[in-house]
Amino acid sequence: VTATPAPIDSADIVVVGAGILGLAVAWALGHVLGSGGGRSVLVVDRHPPSTQATARAAALLTRARGDTATAALVRDTYTAITSLEEELGEDLGLRRVGTLHVAASAARVDALRTLVGAATDPVDWLDGDGAARLAPCLSAEAVERAAFMPRDGFIDPVRLADAYRRSARLAGVRISTGLSVQAIRVERGRVAGIDTDRGFIVAPVVVNAAGAWAAGLAWSAGVGLPQAPVRSQYWITEPRPDLFPRDLPVLVMPDAGAYARPELGALLFGLRGRRSLALDPARLPIDTAGLDLDDTDGGLETLEAGWQMLARLCPPLLQAGIAHYVSGLSTYTADGRFVLGPAPEVEGLFMATGCCGAGIAASGGIGRAVAAAVLGRQGTVDLAPFAPGRLGVLDPFSPALRDACAAARSGKTAG
C-alpha cells in the first residue's frame, strides 16, 4: 500500500494569485487578523508578484462607475492608498490629475449625466472650450460637453500592488511563489486545500484570485465562473510634452471607445474595439507573456477602426508617432461585474476575480470586502451584485460565454 504523501504546508486561509487582487485580499486579511498568532494567511503563485495582468494595467482610478457598489469599491481604494502611505511612510505616486469624461454628441451627454449623476464626488461641467483649456490636446469643436472629476487620478499598478504585499508581510502574511496550483481539493462539499506541483497544502479556506486562470481553477472544484480572459490593449506615443503635458487629466472618450492618460510626456491611450478578443480559459499557457496577443486579432485592426474618431477628438495624435504597443489579458464577465465572495457550491471557497478592466481601481475595496466575507463579517460594500453564482449554472468554457464577455469589454463606457 502506497502511503499518502504528507502535506508540504498548511494555512488557515490560502489566497491563490499574487496579482493586485490577491495581494489586496491578503493585505486586508492580515490587518484584520494581525500577526499575533491568530489565523494564518498564505499567498501562493507560480509567478513573482504582480508580473502578469497587474504589470500591464493602465491603472485609471476613475470614480464614475455607473453603479454604486463598484463606485464604493473604488472609493475604498483611495482610502487604502492613504492608509498604505501612512503605514509604509512613503508616497505611492498617486497622480491626482482628475478625470475628464468627454461627450461628443447630445445623446452621449445624456448618458454621461447618468454616469456621473450618482457620484458622491465633485463634478464640474464644461463646454468644449472649457474642456480644451483643461486638456489642450482636445478639440473644442469636437466636444459637446464634458464632466470633470478633479479628485480622480491614476497610479503605477505595480507600485500599489507592492505596497499591499509589503503591508501584508508586516501583518504576518506569508507569500510563496514558484508553486503552480493545479487544483482546489474538495472533500464532502468543502475545501480541504490546494494541490500544487510540489504537493498538497492543507487549508479549510481558499480565495481564488488567479486572474486569467481563475475559471480553470474554480472548475477543478466544480464551480463555473461567468468570466473569460479578454485581451486589453493600449498604445503609448513618443514623448511629446509640448502636446501632452504631465498634468493632463485622464480622458474618457466613450464616443471613440477610448481612454487616455499622460505617461512621462507621452500619451497612453486605449481603444476598446468593436470586437474584443476572448480566449478559451482551458487553453491558457502558464505565463501570459507567452501569448501572441499582438497579431492574433490584429492590434492594428483595432487601432485603425477607432483612429478616425479618436483623432477627431484629440488631433495632436496625428503629430505624435506611436512608440509602444502593450497587450495583456483582463478577465471580463458577461454582465460587466466583478466575481466576488463565496461560491455557493463549495463551503470555504471564495472568489476575487472578474476584474473587467477595473481591478486596480477597485483593488482596495475588493480586498476589504472579500476579507470581510471570508471572516464572516459585515463589510461596507454589499457583494450581492458580484456573487459568483448570479448568472446560474454555466459552462465556463463555452464559446457563447466567451463572446458575451468580449462584448462586455467592447461596450464598456466608464474608465
Q: What label would you give each PLM region?
A:
Residues 30-54:
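Glycine-rich FAD pyrophosphate-binding loop
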Residues 157, 304-404, 415:
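C-terminal catalytic lobe of FAD-dependent flavoproteins
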